[in-house]
Amino acid sequence: MAKKDYYDTLGVPKNASDDDIKKAYRKLAMKHHPDRNQGDKSKVSEEKFKEAKEAYEVLSDENKRMAYDQYGHAGVDPNMRGGGPGAEGFGGFAEAFGDIFGDVFGGQRGGQQRGGRQVYRGGDLSYAMEITLEEAAHGKEAQIRIPSWDDCNTCHGSGAKPGTKVVTCTTCHGHGVVQMRQGFFSVQQTCPQCKGTGKLIPEPCVACHGVGKTKNNKTLEVKIPAGIDDGMRIRSTGNGEPGTNGGPPGDLYIEIRIKKHEIFERDGDDLHCAVPISFTTAALGGEIEVPTLAGKAAIDIPEGTQAAKQFRLRGKGIKGVRSSYPGDLYCHITVETPVKLTEHQRKLLKELDESLKKGGARHSPSEEGWADKLKSFFSA
């Protein structure tokens, strides 16, 4: 019995667009699917479903449709359909709808492919580097040792034992992916047999265990930019783990950790430091030297300076990697109380104390002295 014309089966003209063919098949598949016609003992719906499926498989494929248009049924090789329409049962319904819905949702079918195989980018690596505050401020060049992956010297990168060969995966036929059906959807997944490589290694190389690469170490020159801050990362492109199936390597991220400084604390581009002075300098004033990252600087301490007084030295901080100007240095004054006094020093301090008490509030930095505040509190 002669086969029915595929266009007539779907009810579309010979110049129908791909979208029209999909819509026609979807309509027929929904109408004649056996799950929707379980009471049809004559199997008419089942046969119509198979006919629609066979027609769709040919007309939805550009090459098959071209051959069918030119040579009719004789131009379509049934082996290209995996044994004819009956060999897959009703799976074509899910496959067809998987194609239709795949177009709706962007038609994504797994990762990037190269030569039919799944291509994967290598993983990124991280490396923690500890530097001083001075090195962070001025920048530096350093050498680090990182892992590297080179072609195995025994198998020359093939992964196969010398004298043996790598064979094509029989599960995915070298594509690295297989079609999995889930309900009405057709999903492409990485081949579980070859893990996406498209090939199998019957006898792995004993030196690299079939990987084709061996792990070594290499020295990498790293340039630390001036102004880098704690927690910032430097990316070294292509120095991560190798990719799979010719995929690009990952990157190396060098994370900067700045050692705690004995004098300075960093806050963005600014620096802070505590500057101790004697109580006589605080009272009488004078010039003192303070440290900076570039050397020493002088500060004029006015008489009567109190503890926690802050002095700002503009431009004595750090110029950050994204800054146009350096930050500032903030000097926080602490007043030191003398210890281990001699009898003579004690006598002088007592005399000073008596003199200050007689002066009362006028010697206090506040408008009202502490003694006056207490007197007011207890008399209230």
Curated annotation (Swiss-Prot):
The entry marks the following residues as binding Zn(2+) 2, namely 169, 172, 191, 194
Q: Which domain of life is it from?
A: Bacteria
Does the record's keyword annotation contain Chaperone? Answer: yes
The UniProt GO MF terms for this protein read: ATP binding; heat shock protein binding; unfolded protein binding; zinc ion binding
- Whereabouts are the CXXCXGXG motif repeats? 152-159, 169-176, 191-198, 205-212
Q: Which family does it belong to?
A: Belongs to the DnaJ family.
Question: What is the protein's given name?
Answer: Chaperone protein DnaJ
